[in-house]
A protein has these predicted regions:
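Bacterial Sec-dependent N-terminal signal peptides
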Residues: 1-21
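Mature catalytic domains of secreted/periplasmic carbohydrate-active enzymes
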Residues: 20-177
Length: 177
């Protein structure tokens, strides 16, 4: 009898505790989706210190680079020809409706000034400019929407635990520390 009671209790707990409410999007969410569908044309910019290696944002893992050595790229990151106004003008003149910018990818390097980490374009590079701020100001001035891609995966953090193939073979221990 005791086993039946415990089994029934566990069953009911699992059934009722794991039930999720059906997602109902807000009107704002639906309106934003419709806007995005209708926009049809925009620019997605993947740009960060990985660009210095003439490779994509996964270069750290794909090429099994040492994470500590990869961090040193920030010391030489100086995009002297960056011009937010020019980028936005080109996008607008081409008929684009938005720009989506990679504010931070898995390498943990932020393309904006943040108090959460010194590993960012303002504090860790000789460039010392907040390109996100400049891009936001240029987009606002020309009436172009701006969206951000921000990765929660962060190979730079010592407490990051590598899931799947991300962050492996980069000089870190299996626990991510």
């Amino acid at each position: 009898m005791k086993n039946i009671f415990i089994t029934t209790l566990l069953f009911l707990t699992v059934v009722f505790c794991s039930a999720q409410e059906k997602y109902v999007p807000s009107q704002e969410n639906l309106t934003n989706r419709e806007w995005f569908r209708d926009a049809k044309f925009g620019m997605f910019i993947h740009w960060g210190i990985y660009s210095m290696l003439a490779d994509g944002e996964w270069v750290l893992t794909n090429k099994s680079l040492n994470e500590a050595e990869y961090q040193k790229l920030a010391d030489g990151f100086y995009p002297s020809k960056f011009n937010a106004d020019e980028w936005v003008r080109i996008a607008k003149d081409a008929g684009m409706k938005y720009i989506c910018f990679t504010s931070r990818h898995h390498d943990g390097f932020s393309m904006f000034d943040t108090k959460q980490s010194d590993y960012n374009i303002v504090k860790a590079t000789p460039f010392k400019r907040d390109v996100i701020k400049e891009l936001a100001e240029a987009c606002q001035k020309r009436g172009l929407k701006l969206f951000f891609y921000y990765s929660h995966i962060d190979w730079h953090r010592p407490d990051y635990y590598p899931w799947g193939r991300t962050g492996r073979n980069t000089g870190r221990t299996p626990s991510g520390t």
